[in-house]
Structures are given as structure tokens and as C-alpha cells.
């Protein structure tokens, strides 16, 4: 049948416990977190459309925190497995055991699209930070919040790959919060893309560029 089309087979994301344990090098039953009195619990929400690297950005933050021995949770929420669907994840970093991975009060919101910015901005704590893609346009709030519009896509394109805009935002995050070292983000990127050395180099360059942009513009 010339008109018959086989169904498209899409790759299925694996967020099983076994898969995540492998990513984070976690041994079940072993409490690898440690108490650090200088760390206050930090709640981060990363949000955008499917295909913008929202979940991988959250995983990178989580891996960086895990590598430093901190308590961390990563909680994904996503629509259909296709580009354009809504996607967000919550990351909590703490100096003690985390009771719930659900984030209702956000310290730092990273938004890659307008719907996410509008949806989650109301949940950002007073004194918190909103970091978003400047291509979204103007955004105003009556709350006492630090709002930063960052040209993350432009930064990514300058390094040859617009899809690394999420990494530019992570670079900004590494400067805005001193909870994690920049080197930990870099090492997490190396772990995430261990089989793709060219991708590693580009992402680390974009990470550094994002951090530099924040230094010069905040």
C-alpha cells in the first residue's frame, strides 16, 4: 500500500529511579548528603516548552548539587512527549533531608517562555529572583522581586547553537546563587554529555558566557 505510513517512533525519556540513580551516582541506602550551616534551602523552578532543555537543565543543577554532597531533589512535570508541550521541573537544594520535592514557594524562577513566566511568577517569594529569556518581552510585577531579562538565546547563538540557551541561564544561576560552585555545573555538563565531547565544549563555553553576562549586567 503506497499510502500506508508506519507510525513515527519517538524516543521515550527514562526518568525511572534506576536511570536517575545512574546519572547521579547514587547508592541506595547510603546518606551521602551532609549538613552545611551556610546553606539555606533553595527552591528552583525551571520552565518552558518541550524541546527547550527544561528537564535537562534541572538535572544539571541536581547533579551539580549531588556531586557536592548536598541534599537535592528533582521533580519533573511535563505534557506529551513532543516539542511544544509544556514542561517544568522543581529542584530543591538543602543542608538537611528534603521533606517534599514539590515547590510551591519559589526562590529562583527560570522561565524560557511567556506562559511559564506568567504561570509561575506569582509563586516566587518576596525577595526572590525571576530569570527569563529577554525575547519574551517586558515583564512587570508588583512584588519585591529581582527580575532579570537575559538574552540567553543570543548568547547561545553567538556560540553556534541556539539550543544551549538553557545553559546560558544556568551560567547566570551560578553567579546569582553561591550555593553551588561553577565548577560543579561544568562537571555536571561533562557527565550529562559524556559521549558527546563537542557538545560539552559548547555548553561549557555558553555556561561561562552566561555567568559573565550576569556579572556585567546585574
List the predicted regions and their residue ranges:
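Active-site cofactor/cluster-binding pocket
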Residues: 2-218
